[in-house]
Amino acid sequence: MRVSPPSSLVRALLLGLPLVRGQATYGENYLSVSRDSEIVSRAFPELEDIELLSPAFTNPDTLPAGWRNGTEGPTSDTELDYFYRNLADRNDWLTYQAADFRSEEGRSIPYLFLSDADSTARNVTKLKVYIQAAIHGNEPAADQSVAALLGKLDRNQTFTAALLERLDIKILPRYNPDGVSYFQRALACNLDGNREHIKLARQQSRDIKQVFMDYNPHISIDMHEFTAPTIYGGNYQPGADALISGGINPNIHPDIRDLLLDGFIPFIGSNLVANGLRWEPYVTGTSNSTPGSLIKLESALEYARANFDIVLSTIESARADFISSNADIVVTDYYTRTNRTFTLVPVDFFETTPSVANLTRARPEAYLIPRTWFDVVAKLRNFGLEVQELDYEYRGTVEALNITSSVLEDVIYEGTVLNSVTTSSFEREVSLPSGSFLVSTRQKNAGLAFIALEPENIDSFVAFNIIPLERGDEYPIFRILS
């Protein structure tokens, strides 16, 4: 029997939460609820043909009291954990995996692993998919869509068997349980988990990154929900049901970017349209719904399954080509502005896929890091990079960078003051003691080293003052050229 959620619940999941109450406090940094007008609500009718088999929809009695006023999420940790454990108990293809670490406030962080034991036993080659949701605690459509996906897979075993014949799927259903508990965007420490991917300032971020890198997926999907009622130009409220983005970093292999932009994203978009939903490329300030998010998840998995050979061969060959490439790397870039129609109105749209490089540099064979900076090396290893610890004194010619300008921001951003630098390069002889480190760029995760270790990059260790520098300083990480 199909369970239809009450209309008030669906509207609630489409609520925008646009205004912060004030300066950050410890916990309870939820946002003010802004309900859509009746005119706007009528433009987002319920989708009667889509089953949402997550606890908030199948059992509305589990909704906490604070849900309607925007102070609590729709499903508690206890309720969601019970839901996933029950699914795992009755399905051999689903394994509940308790992480060996906890959130900042000590909440459990479970993973779910989906795999068909028979195809695994036959040593069938599979695509490895990673899905995470709710890195922002006040975006309920994210983890609700994951729960709805699991509910559908439990209900439709034929669909599940077809997927898992070619895919293994690891899911982090709730990245930020502390944020969900407080119904706030940030981690308990008030840093944004989605700005932690390179700087890795928090232990929870490092733990989750390690699991991701150890799994080593071919495809990763990050589920979000976007604020609905933001007004632009005085009276324009965006009307897209779903936003999709991927392949942004300019050092991503073009074949992988093309696979996303010409394959996955159009397929997902066509399925959204077929179900009566509107979609756009990602821009800030619009909405995302649980039905739309479920369709996106299903579509991504279905595209990967249906195009298994193309997807696998493209990713594997692109990885090999990236490792052996001698092309310059992109250090900084900018976005191109085009005028396009965005759900009925023309807007200036800054395209990020692809962006345009405005600073490139020869790809080094390796980065040479003095043993003094062992804490930097720990982060690099957390990225899945292989780092060699030298058991000999290193002597040789390297490319060094001198800081020619340094501009500090006048506000604190994500726990630090950002430092924008420029550099000039020169060659010099170095002598570094045994115990220093060498990071080869002939590995598939080298793109993360380019982001972190090229000082001009907006997310580099220099930008975030992990390596603090000022004008006239020599950058203490050296480049070994071909």
Locate each region found by the language model:
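Sec-dependent N-terminal signal peptides
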Residues: 11-16
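Structured catalytic-domain cores with a bias toward divalent-metal coordination
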Residues: 2-8, 19-482
